[in-house]
Amino acid sequence: NLVKSNGCTAPKCIEKDRARPVRRFLLTEETTDYEKVLALHDWICSYMYYDVDSLASDEAPPYYATDIVKSRKAVCLGFATLMASLCRSIDIPCNVVSGYALGVGNDTAWTDTSIATDEQNHAWNEVYVDGRWMIVDTTWDCANKIENGEMNKGEVSHLYFDANLQFFSNNHKILEYSKRR
């Protein structure tokens, strides 16, 4: 089992040790980097909730890893920021990628307009593991939602974990990378 249960709740651990508790809280010593990233992905997708309510309001969701974990809610940039923060805390390079995704406030087919747009409506990660960059979108793999003030729990998906570029490009377009690896 890659995820430890040591009696410490994630917000207290992360607050106490400034985002370095993943070594003790989430990961075991004997895992590979790929397994560590998978464990982080699965933890984020099972613990966090996509904040549908904040999209409909002017309320800005949290964007700092500690605030995101405390609130247990975020939109895509928060999910990507948290994943990057956790990966970097265990010395795994991770970029936050901004782009355009179909099905996020738009129709679900690429058109000349959406292909040409420089508008950003989504964020995800690229993580460097085993000598290659892999795509990870925890937002789209998380089925937990907060809508109308209610927390609705869903199942964790792996469809967008280590997704191949051809599949990912069906509904995502990269527009900008974070500068820090």
Predicted regions and their residues:
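Secondary-structure boundary elements
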Residues: 6-74, 84
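Hydrophobic/aromatic-rich core segments of domains that either
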Residues: 78-168
